[in-house]
């Protein structure tokens, strides 16, 4: 007797148990998977992509990066070598970002580690990680950084209010000339009038001291003229984040107008209510922090530099700087290509080729330069003519190699080490951490990319100074009426157009119309044209005109192998290596030995095989020459002479018989042919070339195939070798 209800319950219980088995999962499986991937990354195992951040290299896996970052996902599809914008992310910050991608956590010491990449003791350094996460489009890391900033009371999101609520224009992103950059410590010094304001005893807290963000940009705010207003009521322009201007102390008459308060032209897509007042940025300031060991800038910035906040007044900078300046974080960087400081300085200095033209040619004195025959003053310590010339000889030699790129102009004073670029307007710490930025030619390390760029620019200036002195010496020799250094005079007379110049400077530049007296000076000049190549190799400094050429060049440094075999998975650095490898799977052997007929898949295998013939041929030639010198022959049982040849000579005879169809007719011609060819076999290095040229010498002697008789059939007078091969008299048939 059965009960249907019991059957139904039993079946339902079985289904429920099966469902539980199907839905069971191993706890912590994803965590263990990430842990294994991170271990593989640290060991470089199965890493298929390299990320270059300035001079630092990071190996990773494409799948992990593509699953974590939308920005990196778009890059790893097309290339195995990624170059990130060093203005957006620094090596130390990217190391934290990469650790978060592989571990899912931002360590408690991450803030301090990120601060070490900017300056020791800088408290709001977590903003650098937030800026990098926004740039790389990693939403989980962005949310984590915002949460931590809110917990510390340093984050406040600005909300634009409508109807006079005090917002900013609805821009989706800032203008092209302004980019979010990795935060750096910036000291805003006061104007020349009055002493600097004393630092506050206690940093204020609250929304006034928060770090504001909008559209993935970071803005540091603080107490100022608008401190009484709420953060959402301040009319903060998204185009101008942090006020970098110099502020006069309270009570000074006619304070300077800050950079952030200058009116910007209205945009066509802005609403009518967004008038000029909506584009003004109130002066902001962060609470003062403990003083840091800043380097003192050795030369004041130009008064027209907008990044130092000057209004263009001719007042000079005070020579003394306070030991504990108030610090601000600069979140926006101006591109030199959009005018202002970079263009003005470029117009004052001119391009390197223009400066070379001023110093070169037949001009006796360059405009505004030193007198004829005098070298320009050194731009940095340890130049060619400086006091340390003896100790910097190695630096000069290394400068003949390819130098790295320098996006920014060199400092006005030309300081080599410890001098930040003038338009950055902040003092670098004297030393923090390891020197991550290394100059490839000379091997010197620097703690920041700006100091490295200034150092590389100094290399270029050194080469240009050498070129200018060589040009001045040549022009002086021509003006003094000296003849050419060689006595003949050449094909052209001195009075002919360009005749004297070509006699004095026979080496002409392929990129311009300048010529030089020796190749070394020409090479120094040709390096000035490299400044027009926008893609430098971050490993060796060599520059390229196309990005793809630079990427292929860097594969040789980094050991990348982008060409994979579909059959076995082996990877190669070059396409032709993969083509050679595929012959192993296909069985193709295109390289054939012309001596013995052996076939090979690789050309290098054929070369090794031919060397074996060459060694044997040299030994056989020695025995043949000894036999021709009068050594007794070795008669056979039938009275005929026997030929004792090593294996190499036998192969030569076989080749000669097969391709020339030799017959025993003209012994004199054969003897002459043998005399013409055997001298090649004395040296084993050239023996390879002597295996096939028998046909060539036969044609040169005018011998037809019927007359090229018995090249090696004179065996009655040949001596037997110890390892020879004895055969009957050779016949082509």
UniProtKB/Swiss-Prot annotation:
Q: Where is the composition biased (Pro residues)?
A: 192-206, 284-293, 368-380
Tell me how the protein is altered or processed after translation.
Acetylated on several residues, including Lys-333. Lys-333 is deacetylated by SIRT1.
GO CC annotations? chromatin; nucleoplasm; nucleus
List the C2H2-type ZnF regions, as residue ranges.
439-459, 509-529, 537-557, 565-585, 593-613
Q: Where is the composition biased (Basic and acidic residues)?
A: 344-361
Q: Name one GO biological process term.
A: negative regulation of transcription by RNA polymerase II
Question: Which segments carry the region annotation Interaction with CTBP1?
Answer: 241-247
Presence of keyword Acetylation: yes
Please report the stretch or stretches of sequence annotated as the BTB domain.
47-110
GO molecular-function terms, A-Z: DNA-binding transcription factor activity; DNA-binding transcription factor activity, RNA polymerase II-specific; DNA-binding transcription repressor activity, RNA polymerase II-specific; histone deacetylase binding; sequence-specific DNA binding; sequence-specific double-stranded DNA binding; zinc ion binding
Give the chief site where it resides.
Answer: nucleus
- The reply to whether Metal-binding figures as a keyword in the UniProt entry is yes
Where it sits in the cell: the answer is: Nucleus
The impact of changing residue 335 to A is: Impairs transcriptional repression activity. Decreases interaction with MTA1
Q: Where is this region: Mediates HDAC-dependent transcriptional repression?
A: 154-315
Where do the segments described as Disordered lie?
189-209, 241-421
What else the UniProt entry mentions is: The HIC1 gene is frequently found epigenetically silenced or deleted in different types of solid tumors.
Record note on domains: The BTB domain inhibits the binding to a single consensus binding site, but mediates cooperative binding to multiple binding sites.
Family assignment from sequence similarity: Belongs to the krueppel C2H2-type zinc-finger protein family. Hic subfamily.
Record protein name field: Hypermethylated in cancer 1 protein
Q: Which organism is it from?
A: Homo sapiens
